[in-house]
Amino acid sequence: FGDELNALRAVVCEAIFNPELYKTQLNQAEGQDLVATSANNYYEGVTQAEAEDFYRAMADPADPEPVSYGLNSKLVKDEDGTIRERVWKVGGMYSPAIEKIVYWLEKAQGVAQEPQKATIAALIDYYKTGNLHDFDRYNILWVRDTVSNVDFVNGFIEDYGDPLGRKASWESLV
């Protein structure tokens, strides 16, 4: 572990102690590349302009129910310059952890009250597909459930760590 540990230590110490490296978690200063000047890992090798262009091309202005494009993904630029999303889902990025989330949601579904069973099923679908329309369906069911004795929040929800307001960190509470 000696060389690996020393290499890791060098990276960590640089990130912690170099005031020029990651000045702020979330830069919102006008006229600057907000992605390049913010300390997060939602965009790998991608500039603010490239990210904005990527999602602008994805959006369908005629869609009556547009989704929050990018909410559950990391945007990366490949060696050949191609920009793509790495979606957080079963079989995608963070799959082992998300598989555990699905496992426990399936357990909870077995003891949930009726309206909540459908809500949990929609959330499981979302984690399996990564499809943001499934996430919207889950959220609509969650909001409509006003009778279940136990409430919960679960998903890639908090977008305040992304300078572009697109990517969300995961949270769960019961």
Language-model-detected regions and their locations in the chain:
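N-terminal accessory alpha/beta regions
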Residues: 1-12, 16, 21
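Fold-level signature of zinc-dependent metallopeptidase catalytic domains
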Residues: 19-174
